[in-house]
């Protein structure tokens, strides 16, 4: 084991023990979870993730309603769950016991530098779901995203109509450039600005040189360079389990949450959802419902459960011998955000480094005050939303996640699943001072699918995102390369002796000259990562639209008493990280289910 990895392991162990002693109250919380369940409930929620936890809280407010949540993962109160609580440690939560550890099928147009050409696709398998293992970044998306949903037939989902639900959830810690009218101060979800070092100011100044402003990207204008907003409260991750689920579990007897409950299928009789079959402790069990079943298992698992229940593409279901209940395009329209990373080295130790993150001083600072670099969400302190497509000058097409430190070879191999035959290309990266800019394609034109691997619910589905299948996606990433090079020429970057860190890549040099468009098109097909935002596999829209699975009320077409409430319903992927939109979807769905009149649209904002 390399020295860096050994030091990291030692520090994680120290941190786990000390944090457990100082902050842990797991036994008390765990005792509130259901040990067994009743035969029947009014509502059954499958999945306690970003949207499911919100639903569980809102539906159980009425003490006359019995609500059951079935979560395939464990609770988040185990000693090992320390890795979930400390914001800087989020990379270690992925590929852990709290992750489904999905991977795509081999990709034709990207991932050539990854093991088996497969994209890792982390998804949270724990109370709180992916809000527990993501990078905490809080982005709502662009107002045009939601207005386009509305124009496409999703009545009630325009920006002015969904904004009140974003505000409802939020408990923002005020920051310098905050546009107050766009934020909430009384909701359960803790949100704060991530500004630990001078790195956000550095990025903002560089952006100004290229004509970009700053402010509040969750306010009136998304375009610009900013300090990141994150679901971090008092130095700890604020997952939806912490914000919404645990307070309800502890205080409400009508809410039952069963962990390690892996759903096999929804039971449907005469086009009505009447119950759920699930595995718990190795035994197949069933539970009935009086009102509705809500799938909130995410854009990869919800379509799998639907297809196992007989709802999906007819020919695919027949291939697996599953009786067809409803012929719907379940699992189609998969969209995800793909990235490439630009590495910069600096003359001096300007912001932070991987070694500093591992230092005992950082640990001591965090444990005594819950401040310092360990509160930075995966090192992300700054975001930018830039426009490189002349056809949409005010609608950002790329997002930059700016990470204030360098990674090292071990982290790249572990998290990115780098193919070892390309190890020399990243050798030495951990020994330099610098930072990383991760460019994210916001509106990919490429669409993929989720399909069944077998009729065994315990097997992972077949996930084929078809990244970069559409040429326009590669064109967008190439424009990002050129923008990144332009950033390096700014006075701000030059003031710190900033240089682009890139070893010319031999397989691409064999085909083209270094720094040519052809070189970068080749390179961008090797070292990609996703930011793990799968969406769209149970698409929302007009009932008569043959590409949709749910109507604007999130009801599965042709099936009574069954809704989908998660990222899978998005008709098109949002321009940014998907956790905040999923929470909004949960809030809005709760009002729909309970028949509560929606808040007045905020049309003047």
Question: Where are the language model's segments positioned?
Answer:
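N-terminal redox-cofactor-binding region of secreted/periplasmic oxidoreductases
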Residues: 2-605
């Amino acid at each position: 084991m390399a020295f860096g990895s050994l030091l990291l392991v030692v520090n994680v162990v120290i941190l786990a023990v000390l944090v457990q002693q100082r902050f842990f109250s797991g036994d008390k919380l765990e005792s509130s979870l259901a040990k067994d369940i009743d035969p029947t409930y009014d509502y059954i929620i499958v999945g306690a993730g970003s949207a499911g936890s919100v639903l569980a809280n809102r539906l159980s407010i009425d003490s006359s309603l019995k609500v059951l949540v079935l979560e395939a993962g464990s609770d988040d109160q185990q000693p090992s769950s320390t890795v979930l609580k400390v914001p800087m440690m989020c990379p270690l939560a992925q590929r852990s016991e709290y992750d489904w550890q999905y991977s795509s099928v081999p990709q034709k147009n990207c991932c050539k530098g990854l093991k088996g050409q497969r994209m890792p696709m982390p998804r949270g398998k724990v109370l709180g779901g992916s809000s527990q293992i993501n990078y905490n970044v809080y982005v709502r998306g662009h107002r045009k995203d939601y207005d386009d949903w509305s124009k496409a037939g999703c009545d009630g989902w325009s920006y002015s109509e969904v904004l009140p639900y974003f505000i409802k959830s939020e408990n923002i810690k005020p920051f310098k450039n905050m546009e107050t009218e766009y934020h909430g101060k009384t909701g359960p979800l803790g949100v704060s600005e991530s500004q630990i070092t001078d790195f956000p100011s550095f990025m903002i100044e560089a952006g100004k040189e290229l004509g970009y402003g700053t402010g509040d990207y969750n306010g009136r204008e998304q375009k610009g360079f900013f300090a990141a907003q994150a679901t971090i409260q008092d130095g700890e991750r604020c997952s939806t389990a912490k914000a919404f689920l645990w307070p309800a579990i502890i205080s409400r007897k009508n809410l039952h949450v069963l962990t390690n409950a892996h759903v096999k299928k929804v039971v449907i009789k005469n086009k009505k959802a009447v119950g759920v079959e699930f595995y718990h402790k190795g035994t197949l069990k069933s539970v009935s419902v009086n009102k509705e079943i809500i799938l909130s298992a995410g854009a990869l698992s919800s379509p799998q459960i639907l297809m196992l229940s007989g709802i999906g593409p007819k020919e695919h279901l027949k291939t697996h011998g599953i009786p067809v209940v409803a012929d719907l395009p379940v699992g189609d329209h998969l969209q995800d955000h793909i990235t490439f990373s630009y590495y910069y080295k600096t003359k001096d130790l300007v912001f932070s480094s991987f070694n500093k993150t591992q230092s005992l001083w950082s640990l001591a600072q965090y444990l005594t005050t819950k401040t310092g670099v360990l509160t930075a969400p995966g090192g992300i302190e700054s975001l930018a939303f830039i426009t490189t497509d002349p056809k949409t000058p005010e609608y950002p097409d790329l997002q930059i996640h700016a990470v204030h430190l360098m990674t090292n070879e071990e982290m790249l191999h572990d998290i990115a699943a780098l193919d070892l035959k390309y190890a020399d290309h990243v050798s030495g990266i951990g020994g330099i001072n610098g930072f990383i800019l991760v460019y994210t394609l916001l509106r990919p034109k490429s669409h993929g699918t989720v399909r069944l691997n077998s009729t065994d619910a315990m097997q992972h589905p077949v996930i084929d995102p078809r990244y970069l299948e559409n040429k326009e996606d590669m064109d967008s990433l190439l424009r990002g390369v050129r923008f990144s090079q332009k950033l390096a020429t700014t006075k701000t970057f030059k003031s710190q002796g900033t240089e682009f860190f890139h070893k010319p890549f031999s397989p691409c040099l064999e085909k083209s000259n270094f720094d040519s468009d052809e070189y970068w098109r080749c390179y961008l097909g090797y070292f990609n990562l996703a930011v793990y935002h799968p969406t769209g596999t149970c698409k929302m829209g007009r009932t008569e639209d043959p590409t949709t699975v749910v109507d604007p009320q999130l009801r599965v077409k042709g099936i009574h008493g069954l809704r989908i409430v998660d990222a899978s319903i998005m008709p098109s992927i949002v321009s940014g990280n998907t956790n905040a939109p999923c929470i909004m979807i949960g809030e809005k769905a709760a009002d729909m289910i309970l028949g509560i009149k929606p808040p007045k649209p905020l049309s003047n904002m």
